[in-house]
Structure formats: C-alpha cells, structure tokens
Amino acid sequence: MIKPGIIMGNLISVTGGFLLAAKGSVDLTLMLMTILGLSLVVASGCGLNNCIDRDIDAKMQRTRNRVTVTGEISVYSVLVFSLALGLIGFGLLAIFTNKIALLFAVIGYLVYVGIYSLYMKRHSVYGTLIGSFSGAVPPVVGYCAVTGEIDTGAVILLLMFSLWQMPHSYAIAIFRYKDYAAAKIPVLPVAKGMTRAKLHIVLYIAVFSLVSALLPLAGYTGIAFMAVTCATSLWWLGMALKGYQRDINLNQWARQVFGCSIVTITALSIAMAMDFQLVVQTPLLTLSN
C-alpha cells in the first residue's frame, strides 16, 4: 500500500543529499527527523496514489492484488491513513527543518498526487516528465534541510535526479509494456513506440552523466565522486546502447537497464555523502524562518 521499495530508494537519496550538505558536521537529530518526516510524506503520497489508481491497477497484472483493488482494506481507510501519515510527516519537517526544505516537500507532494496521479499519468505521454520532478525532490529536501537555501548544489541535485528518473521509468514501461497498454496509460513505449523509447533512454542517460559531473566540477564533491560518476554512467550508457543490437530481447534488456539505474543512483548517493567538499556558495534563494 505504501510501496516500501520506493520509500527505501528515497531514504537513500535524502540521506545522500543531507550528508552532502552537512560536509561532515552532522546534526543527528535533524538528519533523523528529516529522513523520518520525508519518508512519511512519501508513504502518504504512495497511499493516495493507490487510491487514485485503483481502477487502472485492476487492469494490470503487477498491481491487481493491491488492497485498494481487492477491497481487503476500504479506500476510505487507506485515504485516512495516508492523510495521517502526510500530516505527521509535514509536521516533522515543519518543526525540525526549514521553510525551503518544507516547500520542496510540499511542491513534490502536490505534483505527484495532484498533477501526475490525478491527470498526467492517464492522459499525457509527458506524465513521466512531470512525475520525475517529484521523484527528484527527496535529495533536495535533505540538502536544503541543512543549508536552508537554494544554491547551485541544490539545483544540480534537482536536475540530476530528475534526469535519472526518465530512463529508469522508461525501462520499467518497456518490461511492463503489456500492463501499461492494458490500462491504456500513455507512457512513451506505448504511445510512441519502442524505437522512440530506446532513443530517449540513451539521450537522458547521456545528459544525466554530464549533469552528475557538475557536482565535482562545481566543487561540491571530489575526485572519488567523479570516478564513481564516470564508471557507473558509462556502464549504464553502454547497457542502454545494447538496445540497438539485432535480435535483442527487449524485456531482458529493459530489466538490465533498470538494474543499472538502481546501482548507479545508489552508488552516486553514497559517493556524494562521503566525498563532499567545502564550498562557499552564494544562495539563489533564502527564506527566513
């Protein structure tokens, strides 16, 4: 109901963003409350998404056994539980972090639940693009919980994780093609075909690789992060290019691209948490508490 895999992935990225900004000076209470608060917000969004998607979930093999589809738990109960999680999560962020971190969490939540889940996912091929923003919010929340401002580092993180979401999501859409087609969800492989989807995967990975390199180039991380970025990005890009081989098994290839995406973003989150650099940066935006 609350998608623990998604929560775990966001936990890793928010921790990476937090430790990147903390630069070795960690406020343990702030870190734990940021992680807990954001995890509850993400869980809330996932629960509301399940309520909204119950009609299309019933048409998909992967999701037809969700409790909101089977009726094991009433939609009303899931709705109340999800809203309660969100209220507690936002409350923790409001009490322990700052206005910038809270603002990003609120915007990400509204984009995911209000714009993506309610409309874009069902009606537009650009739904994945809109959803990528909300998926990129957790590391920025972690980062801004420490800094209290939007600086170049925060912008790079937002771009980096937004770009990562695209090939990651397209890979899922390819190996779950039958499910998305059955539910008439206009993801890129269904709406525009596999050739277009493969091209977009390669292009997004290439741009993601360049943007990831901006963290060390801008002085936020060191040579170790750059090495991890180059190694994982080239590996991921190489796997994506295999999609153009003759007689390729698209489902197997897409699962490999998906697996590479998980390894890549996990490695980068760990690397930026450990290979931080001290940077004097002029904030782009600051909200006074």
From Swiss-Prot:
Chief place of localization: membrane
This protein's record includes keyword Cell membrane: yes
Compartment annotation: Cell inner membrane
Membrane-spanning intervals of the chain: 1-21, 28-48, 76-96, 100-120, 125-145, 155-175, 199-219, 221-241, 260-280
Pathway noted in the entry: Porphyrin-containing compound metabolism; heme O biosynthesis; heme O from protoheme: step 1/1
Coiled coil (UniProt feature): none
GO cellular component term, pick one: plasma membrane
Highest rank taxon of the organism: Bacteria
Keyword line: Cell inner membrane, Cell membrane, Heme biosynthesis, Membrane, Transferase, Transmembrane, Transmembrane helix
Gene Ontology BP, a term: heme O biosynthetic process
Extent of the signal sequence: none
UniProt membrane topology term: Multi-pass membrane protein
Known EC number: 2.5.1.141
Catalyses which reaction(s): heme b + (2E,6E)-farnesyl diphosphate + H2O = Fe(II)-heme o + diphosphate
Pfam family, one: UbiA
GO molecular function: protoheme IX farnesyltransferase activity
Family designation: Belongs to the UbiA prenyltransferase family. Protoheme IX farnesyltransferase subfamily.
Role: Converts heme B (protoheme IX) to heme O by substitution of the vinyl group on carbon 2 of heme B porphyrin ring with a hydroxyethyl farnesyl side group.
Additional record remark: Carbon 2 of the heme B porphyrin ring is defined according to the Fischer nomenclature.
Protein name: Protoheme IX farnesyltransferase 2
Gene that produces this protein: cyoE2
